[in-house]
């Protein structure tokens, strides 16, 4: 129909550059960045390319102005976010810094908080759009609630500073597949001071980084009030990019727990502030508090692994040779452990010390006669650097082990009585373990 308009931008003498088919709104709209000086054409047409006397359109063109604002991520999906801060403790939220047609460092501030409460620094780096903010309440803060603004500022230049405010969408009616059918935008966030929690939570500051393809153990301590012995569920408010984890639960009779973090091979190098949320049931409902920030450093991998194919036969031992060296000098005990060996096989020394100048390690592996023949690509190596600061862990793989059925020997021919055996020759020095590529080169040289 004539109301189904398609808006397109063309460069005169060139091709199309942008377009919009009124997706999700009554009218076509697009934000277009002009690539260079020149002449451009705006084309409005019916979706089916038709025309007529009722096909009349008005086009508005304006220079896009810079805008900023803030939103808040929901801790629980489809539940409007509020902030309940227990007395003498903390609560935290994820806040988004919305920038339109502008970039740069910004700051989020929350004026007019309830009495005797404050929040963490709201500095937002130029390359970040989301930060975590902690709300703190003094132990003697009165029970009070307020609707507050999350005010954003960004200095475009010394003469101009942009100011933005909270614009939070609240869904009131959800349709099929949780589609937002009806709701409203609010410019205030509800913050309240509530009764104190029966515990506190803290993260022990890691002294070593987490490296790419590595893992790190976070130590988390709960400080329980006398008589409080309920389980405490612990999760990160948000994990940095490329970092994975699973929530943990502190049993009622314990006060410490470990949370394992893992880093992907492309995790960005950066030092990130992280915190945990701890939730428990106090009888009349759940209560959640936040820890203070600790700094998590994401660094480059420590080990350089090179894996080659290992050929083995049932009933014969074999050395799995792994190329491994340190990318940079490290202090402490450096070890490499082989994991994921084929079923039924084992290594008498699965963990070896890596010398600073080593280029490879050979792991002896016993292959029983009844080991299942086949190709196994499950072998990985875990490298660790242990010193007085902690343990740096990195896991890489996969190495390939091929187990074959041995070839049956030819039948023995009849021989005359053998002469006395000469004394055995002196034992030759043990050869350096060969990689699969070196084995093939050696066999080719014998031909």
What role is predicted for each listed range?
Residues 2-16, 30-96, 101-102, 151-173, ...:
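C-terminal edge strands of extracellular/lumenal beta-sandwich accessory domains
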Residues 7, 110-120, 236-246, 338-349:
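Short, solvent-exposed loop/linker segments at beta-strand-coil boundaries, enriched for Pro/Gly
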Residues 22-25, 33-36, 113, 122-131, ...:
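Short proline/glycine- and polar residue-rich coil/turn motifs
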Residues 31-34, 132-139, 258-265, 363-371:
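Short, hydrophobic beta-strand segments
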Residues 47-50, 86-88, 96-102, 211-213, ...:
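Short solvent-exposed strand-capping/beta-turn motif centered on an Asx-Ser/Thr pair
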Residues 51-54, 139-149, 159, 265-274, ...:
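Short glycine/proline/serine/threonine-rich loop/turn segments at secondary-structure transition edges
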Residues 79-85, 204-210, 248, 306-313, ...:
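Short beta-strand segments of immunoglobulin-like
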Residues 92-98, 136, 217-223, 262, ...:
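Short edge beta-strand/loop segments characteristic of extracellular beta-sandwich folds
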